[in-house]
Every structure is written in C-alpha cells, then in structure tokens.
C-alpha cells in the first residue's frame, strides 16, 4: 500500500494489507479495524442528516409550454416523480435573468426569473410545492461575477465615478507599468472607462470586487477588503440571499465560492463567508449552504454546511480518470469494469479532507453535474451505474444526484456548444427522457426547435419504460435511496472506516457506524469475482445481507467477503 495512504489508514487505527495477486484479492489482515460507532454531528439543519439532493437543470428538465426550453412550471409538474425517487432535496441551477452566454451563470438581474423559465411567482409557487411534498430546495447563488450586460457593470463602465465604479475589479489605466503580469486575467478596451476589468470565468463575466487580501501599494486600484464600496457590494449580495429566502428557498449552492477575494490564500475569503454564516444564522436560521470550493476543510471552516469534492485530484480516480472523460490527465477509473483502477489514491486525498472537516460540516461527492461528463459514458452499463449508486449513497456526507442518472442517461457526443457548454459539457445537459414519445416526452416542439438535442437512440432509457421493470436501474436506485433514508448507520455524520482498500485491487469495503448500528458496504466495479477479509475490534451479530448480492463468512472477529463481477453488497454487522 502506498506510504501516504498508510498514514491515513493508521490514523483510524485500522490495518495494512499484504498485497497478493491481482485476481486473488484475499489478504492477510495485520491488526483489527477500529470501529467505535461514535460520531459528532456538525452544526447543520436537522433535515440534512438524511438528505439526498437531486440536481435539476431547469432548461432541460421538462418543457410545459411547448417552446423547446424547460421551465419552472415543468419542474412543478414533475415534482411527484422527484418525490417518488425518495430524494429529500432539490438543487436548481440558475434561473435568473441572463443573456445566456454561459447558460444563466452570467446574470443580469439577481432578483428576477428569466422569462424563458417563467416568473418570480412561478419560483415562489415551486418552492411551496416542493415543501408541500416534504422536500427542501436550494438554488444556485453566483457571487463572484455577473454578465457584462448587468446594470451594475454598465454603470461601472462610466468614466465618471459613481456608486458602482468599484463594484468590479478595474485597473486605473489601460496601460500602466507592470501591467503585463495582469493582462491574462483582464479585458482591455471594452468601454470609455480608462482601465481593464478582471474576468472571473469567460471574458464576458466581470469579477465582482471583494477586495485584495494583500493589496499592492504600487497598484492603488487593488482595494482592501474593508473598503466602503466593497462593503456596500457585500451587503447587496446579502440582500440577494434575503430576497430568495423570503421567497421560500431553503438555502444555496454557492458557485465558485473560493474565488472572491483576490491574492488570497483562502483565509480572507473564509472570513467573508463566516460573516455570511453569522448573518444567515441570525436572520434565517436553518439555511443550508454548500460550496463549490472543492477543499471541504477550508469551506466548512468558513461556515459552509458542506462542500463539493469534485474538481481536483482524487475525484477523477473514481469515475473520470481517462482523458476521454476529462482534459487534465490519463489513467484508469476505479468504477470501470476493466478493473484497473486504484481506490487508494482517492482515499489518500479524500481522507485528508474528511478528517479535517467532519466535525464542522459535510463532504458532498457528486455523481456528476452540469460541468462533468455523465457517469454513464464510454461503455458503462446500467449494472456499472448501480454499483456507483451503491457507493455514493452509502458514503458519509450529503449525496448529490444529477437528473437522468437514475435512469442511466448517457453522455452524448458531438453536440453544438451552445450557451458556453464547452469541454464536453454539452453532452451532459441534454433533455430529460420521460417516455418513448417524440423528444422522449421532454417537449412537444419539433426536434429542430429544441433547446438541446435529445438522445434518439433506439435503446435510449426513459422513465416510463423503467417504471414498468422491477429490476430496472431506476427501481434499484429507489431501493438504495430508501436504504439511505432509513438506516441510522447511513446518516450523514455516521462513522466511516475503510476496512479493505489495497492499491490497484478490488473490492473496496468500508463500515458505517452509528452506536451499535453498523453496516458493511462492499463494492466491486471490476468484471471479475473478488474477495477480501479483515478483522474487527468488536463482536458482531450474525451478518445479514440487506441489499445487493454477495457472500460473507464470520469466524470469531474475522470477516471474509466474496462478490460477483460488477456488484455490490451491503451487510448488517451490528455490535452484539
């Protein structure tokens, strides 16, 4: 086992395995794995303890008015289906007014629903309908930039100083000594104002100004974080939160949460988010926030209830290590049937974040999202996807599903890059597949008028077909979500102890514990039979298989498991 992982495993007093042949994974445990059943619940809304989130991309979920674009009324009409999955919360991508150069993340009015989605009253009614079904709803909050068409930015372009002049990061001149080191992040010659503005993603998304952690005295345009104009911007962004919380949403997913304060090591940005947390706790107690930061230990210290673990090294080892799935590096995903992946590298990175964040908040490992290729790609089958769901729904923290993954919607290739959907993002934002009618039931318009093309393959999955099949992926996902929602050992904060994880080997096994309630989860994505064994530090009751397929043998405190190719097994191994 790699040395860095040994440090992580030893820190939970578990074990080191002796490596053996690739196809014979039975190993000789050295010491007992320490499972205590103790766990500390972070400060978080109580409903998050069992939460399973379902991400809906509004423009491609359901078109209720026949214009080819999904809308809020369409989501309302499909809430009974969402509820039937067993999920407890919904995350909605941006529905604000926008020119849609970046699919709505380029906002022109934070206080108004874009007409293509409906009205503010539709949003308020959607929130109420979600609550009526016993679910919660969070919305995307985009604090780091706006569209160049936003009235604030247009006002900041005026050469005459005004309220908005410093709400965006502008230099004092278009040409100045030392400008070369800034040019890569700034846009020149856009308007009559003499200066360059910083962009925070695409060029047309100017960065809102939260100040500089360490302003350069030679560059007076680098304002400190407590500058009066910056404080005014921060208060306005709090007003945006107030507006939507008053409308009925339960919280926010914070886009690019770590990219606010410039020249920052993260500490100043964290300080800002702590002030936001204090304001929310005072005025809107129980508000849930999840960051797009990808450094959970930093994000939860900043007051977030959770943070996504998906952008950086470690996550790719699970589902998208290959270059065909990402543009960063090459390798083998652990959750592929070829069975060439390595779970230890994921654990090395994940455990480093987990141990430093678990007492303060949660890690959210997403199945996918609007920026990631769908998990069903490059030959993965429904059987492969079921193993992924078993893993994701039994890990600690808050699971986030992406719409359509529950039926195995595929990543589509070679689609036009509309609204900024570059880097493979076009293929993961296609319309939801409801039935076998034209456009898979998403819309009644002719196909050429669709916002995005739908999967027209003969074997394209759909909800209605899978509803009829008790063995379908959809129904298996429902069973796993039900398990997640009812087992005390699967609460978000329940103990997590890896018990079988060897470099380049399968399966991966771990225990979730809450008091004397213990579950052993074993996943085998590889297309071969595998087995493994380990020793427990406690005397357990007779193991019982409660989900999946596999065999288990208990000899005193030693447990041995065996799994078929591409399978998972969940056993109850409660303490006596």
Protein language model regions, located:
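Active-site and adjacent substrate-binding regions of carbohydrate-active enzymes
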Residues: 21-576
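Bacterial N-terminal signal peptides
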Residues: 8-16
């Amino acid at each position: 086992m790699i040395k860095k992982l040994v440090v992580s495993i030893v820190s939970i007093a578990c074990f080191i395995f002796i490596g053996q042949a690739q196809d014979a994974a039975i190993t000789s445990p050295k010491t007992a794995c320490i499972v205590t059943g103790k766990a500390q619940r972070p400060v978080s809304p109580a409903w998050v303890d069992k939460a399973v989130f379902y991400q809906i991309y509004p423009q491609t979920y359901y078109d209720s008015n026949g214009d080819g674009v999904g809308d809020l009324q369409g989501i309302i009409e499909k809430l009974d289906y969402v509820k039937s999955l067993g999920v407890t919360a919904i995350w909605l991508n941006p529905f604000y007014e926008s020119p849609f150069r970046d699919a709505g993340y380029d906002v022109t009015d934070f206080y108004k629903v874009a007409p293509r989605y409906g009205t503010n009253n539709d949003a308020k009614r959607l929130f109420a309908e979600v609550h009526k079904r016993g679910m919660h709803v969070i919305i995307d909050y985009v604090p780091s930039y706006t569209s160049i068409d936003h009235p604030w930015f247009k006002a900041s372009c005026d050469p005459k100083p005004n309220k908005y002049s410093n709400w965006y990061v502008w230099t004092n001149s278009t040409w100045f000594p030392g400008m070369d080191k800034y040019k890569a992040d700034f846009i020149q010659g856009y308007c009559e104002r003499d200066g360059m503005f910083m962009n925070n993603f695409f060029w047309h998304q100017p960065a809102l100004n939260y100040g500089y952690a360490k302003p350069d005295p030679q560059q007076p345009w680098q304002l400190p974080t407590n500058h009066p104009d910056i404080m005014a911007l921060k208060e306005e962004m709090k007003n945006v939160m107030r507006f939507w919380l008053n409308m009925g949403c339960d919280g926010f997913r914070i886009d690019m949460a770590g990219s606010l304060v410039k020249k920052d090591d993260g500490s100043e940005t964290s300080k800002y988010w702590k002030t936001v947390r204090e304001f929310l706790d005072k005025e809107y107690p129980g508000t849930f926030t999840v960051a797009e930061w990808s450094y959970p230990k930093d994000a939860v210290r900043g007051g977030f209830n959770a943070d996504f673990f998906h952008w950086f090294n470690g996550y790719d080892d699970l589902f998208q290590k290959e270059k065909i799935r990402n543009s960063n590096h090459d390798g083998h995903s652990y959750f592929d049937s070829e069975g060439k992946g390595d779970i230890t590298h994921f654990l090395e990175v994940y455990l480093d974040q987990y141990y430093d964040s678990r007492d303060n908040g949660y890690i959210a490992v997403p199945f996918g999202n609007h920026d990631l290729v769908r998990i069903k790609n490059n030959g993965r089958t429904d059987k492969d996807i079921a193993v992924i769901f078993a893993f994701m729904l039994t890990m600690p923290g808050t699971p986030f599903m992406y719409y359509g993954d529950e039926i195995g919607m595929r990543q589509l290739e070679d689609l036009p890059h509309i609204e900024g959907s570059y880097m493979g993002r076009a293929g993961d934002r296609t319309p939801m597949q409801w039935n076998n009618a034209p456009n898979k039931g998403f819309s009644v318009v002719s196909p050429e008028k669709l916002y995005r093309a739908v999967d027209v393959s003969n074997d394209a999955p759909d909800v209605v077909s899978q509803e009829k099949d008790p063995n379908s992926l959809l129904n298996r996902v429902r069973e796993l979500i039900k398990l997640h929602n009812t087992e005390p050992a699967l609460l978000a904060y329940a103990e997590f102890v890896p018990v079988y994880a060897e470099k380049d080997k399968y399966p991966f096994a771990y225990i979730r514990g809450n008091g004397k309630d213990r579950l052993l989860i074993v996943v085998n994505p590889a297309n071969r039979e595998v087995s493994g064994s380990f020793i427990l530090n406690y005397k357990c009751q007779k193991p019982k298989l409660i989900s999946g397929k596999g065999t288990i043998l208990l000899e005193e405190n030693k447990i041995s498991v065996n799994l078929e190719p591409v399978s998972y097994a969940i056993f109850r191994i409660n303490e006596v």
